[in-house]
Amino acid sequence: MKQEQNRIIRDTKSDLLFVQGAAGSGKTSAVLQRIAYLLYRFRNGLDEKQMMIFSPNRLFNHYIANVLPELGEKNMIQTTFQDFIAKRLGKLEVESLFEQFENETNEARKEILLLKESTFLFELIGKYIALLQKGGLRFKDIKFRGETVISKEDIQAIFYATPRYKMPARFLETKKVLREKLYELANLEAKKAWVKDEMELLSEEEYRALVPTKLEFQSFDDEQDYLAKKIVRLKFKKLHKSVLDNQFWHMKQQFGHFMQYAPRLFDLAEFNISKEDWENEIHRIVASLNENKLALEDAVLFLELCDAALGKKVNRIMRFVFIDEIQDYSKAQIAYLKSIFPSSQFTLLGDLNQAIFKRNEKSLLEEIAPLFDASRTSVVELSKSYRSTEQITNFTKEIMTESERIIPFSRQGDVPKVIQTENFVAMMDVVQREALKLKKSSNMVAIIGRNQEICEEAYLSLYKKMDVKLVHMGNQKLSEGIMILPSYLAKGLEFDSVIVLDASEKTYPSSADKTLLYTMCSRAMHDLVAVSNGEITPLFKTIPNHLYEFETLSVKTQLPSDS
C-alpha cells in the first residue's frame, strides 16, 4: 500500500495518472497528499491557483476544504463538473446532479446517450463548422426600443462578405463591422423625437452626470447636439456589449440545427438509433433550450460548438487537474476538459464498481487512453479497502460480479444486517429503531436512499420522532448526527454507520443496479444495515448467507389511507 501510495503522491512526469481503487482504498487520501507534495516540490513556481479538483458534489468539496488546511496547504480551486460547465454556459442552466440522476431510467434514450458520451459527435462538430463557412449560420435581429436596427439577414450578409478566414476571425470581423454600424445608427437616432423628450426631462443631477463641469458650449444648439448624442450612446452601450458578447449569433438555434443536420454526416443505424428516436431527442433539446436549460450530455456539445465557432478560451496556466469519481464521466467530458486545460497534467481517480451514471460497460481507461500520450500515462491500482470492517467489505464486494481484486482490511466488526418488512410504515419503524441504536456509538449515521423522492418520504416520516437532517441539492452540508441523503450526494464520502433505505426488489430489481447499491453500502465504516419495503433485492440473495444477518419482520402495520 505504501509503495502504491508513494507512486501516486510523487509522480511528477505523467500527463495522465489513472488511479483505480476499491471503495475505501485511500485514493482520496493519497491524492490530497499528492497535492501537498506537489505544492512543496514546486514551491517556487506553483501555487494553489494552478491546481484544480473536480469533486462529485459540493458535500465532498466541504470535506476537501477541511482536510487541505490540516495538511498545511491553502485551498486549491474546487468545483464540480456541473458547476464548471454552468459557469461557462452563462445564462443557460445546466441540469443538476438531481435531475441527471432522476432522468437516468429512460431506456429509450440509452443508445443516443452512449453516442453523445463518446467523442463521435464532439469530433463531428469540426465538419459541421467547415460547412458553416459557406452558409447556414443562424443570427438574431439587433433591436433597439423594440425595433430592429440591424436585421439577421443583414448580419448574415456582413458575415459571409468577410474574407474566408477561420470562423473565429470572421466573427471578430463581423463584430467590428456591426459596431461601426451601431455608431452610425446612434448618430441618426440622436435626431429622433424621443431623445428631445428625454433631454427636457433631465434633472440638474442627471445633466451634470452627462456634461463635464469644464465643458462650455458655443451655442444652445451645440449643447442640445452634445446631449442628444450622449444620451443615445449611453443607451447604445448595451447593444455594443451584446455584439461583443456574440449575442447576435443564435447559439441555441444553431445547436438545434447541428443536431438536426448531424445524421446527414453519419448513419444513425450504425449506432442502433432510429430516425424517430433521434427526432424525439431533437424535440427534447429544443424544448429544454426554449426554457434556457440543457442536459449535461448536451452542454459539452453545445460549448464545443460555440468554442469551434468563436474560439476556445483555454487555460494554459493550470498545471494540475484532479478528477475524482472519474467512472461517472464520459469520454466527451474528459476530452472537453483536456481541450480547456491543454498544459495540465491530469490525475483521474475512480472505482469502476461505483459508476452510477455511466451506461457503457467498456473500460474507461480504454476509452480515454487515446486522448493522452501513452508514453506519459501511468496506472496505479489500489485493491485493499481500509474504510470498512472486514465483514462489511466481504458483504459489499459480493454485490459486484467482478470484485475478486478487492481485499478487505482485517478490522473486525458485526456482519451487516438485512431486514425485510411488509410495508412503508413498518420499514420506517425499523429505520428509526436502527438509527437511534447506531447513534449511540456513531458520530455520523447516514440513511441513504436511491433518489430524492424516497429520502423526502423518509424524512417526513421521521422528523417529528427524532433529530434528523435531510441533505438535498439546496443544502449540501454534512453534520454530526443522523442524516438522510440520496445516493448521488453520498459519492466519495464515508460515514460511521449506514442504513440503506428500501433495499427492495422493486427499487433495485436487476444487475443494472449493482454499482449503485455497491456504492451506497460501501460508504459504511463500522456498521451497515439495509432495510426493505417488501421482498429484498435479488442482488442480496446471491450473497452467501454467512456474510450477513437476515431478519424478516411480519408485523401487521396499518398503512395510512390516501385521504
PLM features: residue spans?
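Motif I (Walker A/P-loop) of helicase-class P-loop NTPases
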Residues: 28-38
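Pre-Walker A (Motif I) flank of P-loop NTPase domains
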Residues: 13-17
